[in-house]
Amino acid sequence: MSKPTVALLYICTGKYTVFWPDFYKTFRQNYLPECDKTFFVFTDAPSIEFDTEPDVRRIYQKALDWPYSTLKRFEMFLTQEDALKAFDFLFFANANLLCEQVVTAEEFLPRTEQGEVLLMVQQPGFWDKTPPFYSYDRNPKCRAYIPYNCGRDYVSGGLNGGTAPAFLALCHTLARRTDDDLADGVIALWHDESQLNRYVAELDPAEYRLLTPAYWYPEDWHIPFEPKITVRDKSKWIDMTAVKGKKPELGFVARKWDAFCQNYLPFVLAVRDTLLLKHLPRYKAGHNP
């Protein structure tokens, strides 16, 4: 019986190339050892370590300004659609991940025999919260919008995938929605992650496998999961203010208002949206317009 084929999609433009060597070494050794893996590396670097290895494909990708470097990732992947169609599974992984524990196919791949075609991972900041308190995009003008009374899971934008047909369909839908938003002068709150969460909220939960934050465990955090895949702190490696810009400091009143908006206001807004009968459409994976 042949091994399942897996394409790992990896973006490291600009300073993010610093993460590539350790990512490659740990994922090559520990991630899905039962599968035949190929690394698709989107980078503006003229060369990267290991790019002569037979399982590495270096693809030129111009470094985009923030936030387009993350907004446009679905579009980037689709430049390789013809090659990616040949694989059984496709997964995107953030540049700063380490796979220091063995992650098996049995525990990670979508269980297609049960109807699962996508793989998502809980975002660790929200694993113990309820949907009104998730950091969904709440702007009705945005195509990533989710009302306060809707949604089910909050998933990470930095590790996800699925069967090749299902994931490529997802990329087409989210690339189109992102471009339509940009044409309207709108950018989703958390960019690709907000778009992804709207897509997931439209699905039957039986269509995606949801893993715990053990597979997206931030460095130096303390949450009740045994780390399998670690998220390295980017600020220890690169100047994030140079990439994203410096966030303005909030004054006392602004901090109090922000705390109220995070801890109490969602209750009220969830009741409002329920009374207004707000809801999301339901689509079968791959058929989201």
Regions picked out by a protein language model, each given a short descriptive name:
Residues 46-55, 106-111, 222:
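Short loop/helix-cap segments at secondary-structure boundaries that form the rim of catalytic
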Residues 1-69, 80-86, 256-261, 265-281:
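N-terminal anchoring/stem segment of glycosyltransferases
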